[in-house]
């Protein structure tokens, strides 16, 4: 006789198995989308690659758009793990801001995503295509700019950056330099782009830093050592 406890255990096992399958699907989807674009994702392609039935994939994602949105969110989780969390131990203010910049460049440099920055690629693919996928990518890009802006404000409150600096402007400049490095590396294979970006960001931070703040930024030698360690 099947007891309630056994039914519950069987249900939990099935759910766990289903979640493992979903995560395996998303891992493959992120890898494909990072290099070939979100439009390169199809239920049929993933089913073949993972040796699953199409109906099995439809059980997890009812449409291509659902799959794309889930893939974007999976990439966001990876980004948080690889870029945001490593900065938690940095001191508030300029050390944290510089760490965000350095780790972001390192995440592209290390090839966390096969196609460089996942969100730079997704933004280029969907920026002229209104809809839920574009909206989600835009929302995540805004989160990143807000994170940089918050770090700038923290540095100003700690009296490490000049208070006449516009946080939104500085965040925009940093992001532009990072995106430029990603573009140069992906399109031209220019590994020096990361050094140039780090030099430019560090110079911009030094230019806006107070006397206290300037002592918290790495020297050129330390910065280059950091960049080499991430290759």
Identify the function of each model-found stretch:
Residues 80, 95-98, 102, 131-157, ...:
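Amphipathic alpha-helical packing segments from all-alpha helical-bundle domains
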Residues 107-110, 154, 174-192, 204-213:
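Amphipathic C-terminal alpha-helical segment
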Residues 70, 84-115, 167-174, 216-221:
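Hydrophobic alpha-helical connector segments
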Residues 50-61:
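Short hydrophobic/aromatic patch on the recognition helix
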Residues 1-36, 40-49, 66-69:
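Basic, helix-initiating cap at the start of DNA-binding domains
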């Amino acid at each position: 006789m099947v007891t309630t406890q056994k039914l519950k255990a069987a249900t939990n096992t099935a759910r766990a198995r289903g979640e493992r399958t979903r995560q395996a699907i998303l891992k493959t989807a992120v890898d494909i989308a990072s290099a070939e674009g979100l439009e390169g994702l199809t239920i049929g392609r993933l089913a073949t690659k993972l040796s699953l039935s199409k109906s099995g994939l439809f059980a997890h994602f009812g449409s291509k758009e659902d799959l794309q949105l889930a893939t974007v969110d999976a990439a966001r989780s990876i980004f948080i793990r690889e870029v945001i969390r490593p900065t938690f131990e940095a001191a508030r203010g300029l050390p944290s801001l510089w760490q965000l910049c350095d780790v972001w460049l390192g995440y592209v440099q290390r090839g966390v995503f096969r196609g460089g920055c996942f969100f730079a690629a997704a933004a280029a693919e969907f920026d002229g295509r209104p809809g839920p996928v574009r909206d989600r990518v835009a929302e995540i890009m805004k989160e990143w700019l807000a994170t940089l802006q918050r770090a700038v404000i923290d540095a100003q409150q700690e009296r490490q950056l000049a208070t006449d600096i516009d946080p939104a402007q500085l965040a925009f400049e940093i992001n532009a330099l990072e995106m430029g490095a990603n573009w140069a590396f992906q399109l031209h294979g220019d590994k020096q782009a990361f050094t140039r970006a780090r030099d430019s960001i560090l110079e911009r931070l030094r230019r806006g830093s107070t006397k206290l703040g300037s002592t918290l930024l790495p020297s050129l030698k330390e910065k280059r050592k950091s960049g080499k360690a991430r290759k």
